[in-house]
Amino acid sequence: MAAKELHFNVDARAALKRGVDQLAEAVKVTLGPKGRNVVIDKKFGAPTVTKDGVTVAKEIELADPIENMGAQMVKEVATKTSDLAGDGTTTATVLAQAIFREGLKNVTAGSNPMALKRGIEKAVAGIVEELKRISVPTTGKKEIAQVGTISANNDPEIGNLIAEAMEKVGKDGVITVEEAKGLETTLETVDGMQFDRGYLSPYFVTDPEKMEAVLENALILIHDKKISAMKDLLPALEKVAQLGKPLLIIAEDVEGEALATLVVNKLRGTLRICAVKAPGFGDRRKAMLQDIATLTKGQVISDEVGFKLENAVLTDLGSAKRIVIDKDNTTIIDGAGEQKDIEGRVREIRGAIDKSTSDYDREKLQERLAKLAGGVAVINVGAATEAEMKEKKARVEDALHATRAAVEEGIVPGGGVALIRAQHVLKDVKVAERDEQIGVDIVRRAIEEPLRMIVQNAGGEGSIVVEKIRTAKETSFGYNALTDVYEDLVQAGVIDPTKVTRTALQNAASIAGLLLTTEALIVEKKEDKPAAPAGGPGMGGMY
């Protein structure tokens, strides 16, 4: 085992502070509408140009192992805030640096770190309650567009696209971000339920121009096993043929004699029919087939419950107004399912999401929920170059997270103003001793820091702006750094999701509290490697 190096008390905290400051200084230049760019060197390809705090933070590794510890702990603040709220990473970093810096001065002057930490926690709890009180629910498309615009570094095109997507698919809908082939950034929405399985044979196509099979007012047969023998399918097919309605067969697979017979009947015009494979795999496939059955008011014909395919009757089949199948996807529009059954199924999936511990499972459950409850929207991000594409895609993803957070917990005035507005509650925080009061005062000073930084990046003087806003009476009065005017920020569209501001403060205080109460550091000792031996003499005339 390699030898370790130990550092204690003042030395340890001073080294941590150097690391925290290096990371924070690189990140906080990006804060606000007039934040500066950071250029990150890449081993391959063009350098990345970004104004996204978490992207900058993730790239930072310091040479000194102790300083690097401090930097990594603050990086944790940025990434945790990004994961939970999707935005506010730079604000969280600025707050963590400010709380740690002010706290360190007091610890060095003899304050008890544990009492400071208790004071910081009490102050943060008070501010979080006040943020919830001044929070306003997001109701309209306009507010969602404003939140998206701010999170996408003041790009109204992205804000409007996200608002439109949310309006179309609802708050439970899935919105995905893809790279477009051209320069335009566009929005595509899919009504109804879509799954990624296409027709099993191109002979099923009804529209040769678009290479699509379109079935109007169709019945749907859902089976969880392979269909290869025609005799199993025949009874159901005869009943459907008598009705004269189109039929979609969804099964694990349709092959051999069964597929050939279906194709022949389709080509002769005896049946309007199409067959597709069931979506998903294993248990997820069973669940997705049950979702389709609920949506279309059908039954999953399954041997597992003693339900054989040859015994299927018309009432076991689902139905939908329109079904569109291309070579890759099947879309079921306007299924005949009862609303109460669909809502029951949605509640089941929501329960499973709450209990799920795996991110992957949760994502898949969320997709199923969207297909049942809302719909699916795809934002195709277009740009002129690869570097611009990456940067823009990251901004769209940030803005998407932030708008979801706004819908969840509401909005507060942006531009660092909400924290200043919540400052007054700190005078009522009950403390047990003087050092706890110092902890409360540390937070009082630290929550001004995001506003100071926004003003500083815009070329102004932070202290003057903070004082002017603190003495104003209106809750949403603040400084709009983009236009350089004082105005009602909510009306001007400068708003932040409450969840973003709350998460940034809580995460920053948590890590700063840990850093302040650190008394020892253990790092691996650097080994003094001996110089490499010089090369040996040449081998003479040997070949």
UniProtKB/Swiss-Prot annotation:
InterPro entries: Chaperonin_Cpn60_CS, Cpn60/GroEL, Cpn60/GroEL/TCP-1, GroEL-like_apical_dom_sf, GROEL-like_equatorial_sf, TCP-1-like_intermed_sf. PROSITE patterns: CHAPERONINS_CPN60. Signal peptide: none annotated. Coiled coil: none annotated. Its EC number is 5.6.1.7. One of its GO terms (biological process) is protein refolding. ATP binds at residues 30-33, 51, 87-91, 415, 480-482, 496. It catalyses: ATP + H2O + a folded polypeptide = ADP + phosphate + an unfolded polypeptide. It comes from the Bacteria. One of its GO terms (cellular component) is cytoplasm. It is found in: Cytoplasm. One of its GO terms (molecular function) is ATP-dependent protein folding chaperone. Keywords: ATP-binding, Chaperone, Cytoplasm, Isomerase, Nucleotide-binding. Forms a cylinder of 14 subunits composed of two heptameric rings stacked back-to-back. Interacts with the co-chaperonin GroES. Together with its co-chaperonin GroES, plays an essential role in assisting protein folding. The GroEL-GroES system forms a nano-cage that allows encapsulation of the non-native substrate proteins and provides a physical environment optimized to promote and accelerate protein folding. Belongs to the chaperonin (HSP60) family. This is Chaperonin GroEL. It comes from Gemmatimonas aurantiaca (strain DSM 14586 / JCM 11422 / NBRC 100505 / T-27). The gene is groEL.
